[in-house]
């Protein structure tokens, strides 16, 4: 559910010209990058390891596709393996490069909440997708919304409307939905 929501939101934003910035980790991060790529949009992956290391290993195809139509960036030198503490540290770069941070999935203690709190400290906007009140993976999102720290969104248009005054040309297009069958497939998936 969460990965599909992330992919749909990224797809809709990229169809209107936004750039998706995420961390290329398994789960929601990868889904966000996939949505951007499927929309034919730009995406930037901020890595918690050196550029020469693929983490997680199953994302090799995703790294290649992001590099072809976006960017892979890292503050870590080549040869630096992914370490658990790298990810919360790199999240400041993700939020710092972004106009807004969108939280789709967040347990009470998570990297997504670290990114959201960093974004707030940096004066950036934060949005969150609400979830079932008894779902552990929605507790962080629901708390951000309840505390007034994040705007409630249900799709990409909720985000785009917030920036209509700044980017009116981005809002003029028709509302787009993630199609059931998508034109984009990772090279590895095509084989």
Annotate each language-model stretch with its function.
Residues 3-191:
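Glycine-biased, small-residue-rich flexible motifs in mid-sequence functional cores and linkers
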